[in-house]
Amino acid sequence: MNILLITPGINKTFNDNYHSYKSIADDDNNILAISNQEIVAKGGDLRKDKEVEIDGSLVIHRIFKSIREQQSFVRRFLYKKKLNNLVSEFRPDVIFCEEISNLRLAMKIKRELGVPIILRTEFAFDADYPYRSMGRLLKIFKNPLTGDRLASAVGGLIWRWAYSCADSVISCYYEDALKQPEVYNTPFYYVPWPTFHPNIEGETKRKKDRAVFIGAFEPHKNLQELLVTIPEILEKTPLKEFCFVGAGHDLGVIQQLKISYPDSITHIRSLGREQCLKLIRDSFFAYSPATRGGWGFIGDSWAMKTPIIVTHNHYGFNDNIDSVVTAPQDIVNRVKSLYENDSEFERVRTGGFKRYVENHSANAVGARFLEICILACTKFSE
């Protein structure tokens, strides 16, 4: 199968989805990826990627210089000839479009070649949380007079348009699978965010007195909770060190903890991928207070066989099976239980790894993407 991938960013170091697409290509399929050269790393750092990259049957053409240029009708017109030549020569069977912002380009190609579109979004639109999807655009419509109502209405219109354009829709958000947003006869699928990890050298040297959190310090990560829970954990359990890796809006929370517990709080602004994985692997447990998102850190914890403690069940966590699901006021007892019960520690550790392999690994997600592509092509040709 020939799959045309239109994506706002693809890089084997910074994008776990890269490895899902690579697994599809390695399964006797061809993928032509159209993207841009801009890489937004954790912490907001901008980097430039090379224009052409060939990795077996996965071929990437970053013909646009930036995400903004890729989304601009005028700039896309300037690259029209180059884009048309690439796509015509490739002759795709299906268009795999990441995010609504790329849908107009996907629609143009669909009209010319007569192939189905699969739209993959991080979140489906939810009128109760209008800024979760298309937040940057919809916040333009927020005002004191109408509040969120206008933004919600506009978001609903855009979402209905997206459904009318797509032949299948994929969301990476677990709660979307529970709500099954209105689909207008368009198949809707939930496919988890993938996690990829390279082979990590060396044996696990787990520090029983250390825990870890890695990720962007953004409001939805709910770091304010840590001002209550971390002091309790440090003072009432065997934990002696909590290591944070990341930066962002709520950096002040970590700084406050550092002032109160200078010998116990470690903060690293940025760390390489392999170093992050080793840090997770060698820590006794991971802790995420996030109310949504944080999928990369969660998946990495499962992949590294490190138990993860969560205080909000936004990812279909199974308590005492693949994670420890608790409340802030009960977290001390649950941490103590991990320390005191080897069987519980082992059960959560192995259960998380099993979930990673079956549902969240690059190969598992890639296989699901390919299955949806085949279904879309079959239905489209009927």
Please report, for each region that a protein language model flagged, where it lies by residue.
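Short His-centered aromatic/hydrophobic patch
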Residues: 97-102, 121-122
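Membrane-proximal helix-turn-helix segments that form the acceptor-binding/catalytic region
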Residues: 81-85, 125, 140-169
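Glycosyltransferase donor-sugar binding loop
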Residues: 214, 241-254, 269
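Acidic donor-binding loop of glycosyltransferase active sites
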Residues: 167, 281-293, 306
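A charged, aromatic-enriched C-terminal amphipathic alpha-helix characteristic of glycosyltransferases
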Residues: 340-374
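Conserved donor-binding/catalytic core segment of Leloir-type glycosyltransferases
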Residues: 170, 195, 203-221, 227-230, ...
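Nucleotide-activated donor-binding/catalytic signature segment of Leloir-type glycosyltransferases, i.e.
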Residues: 254-274
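N-terminal subdomain of nucleotide-sugar transferases
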Residues: 1-48, 233-236, 363
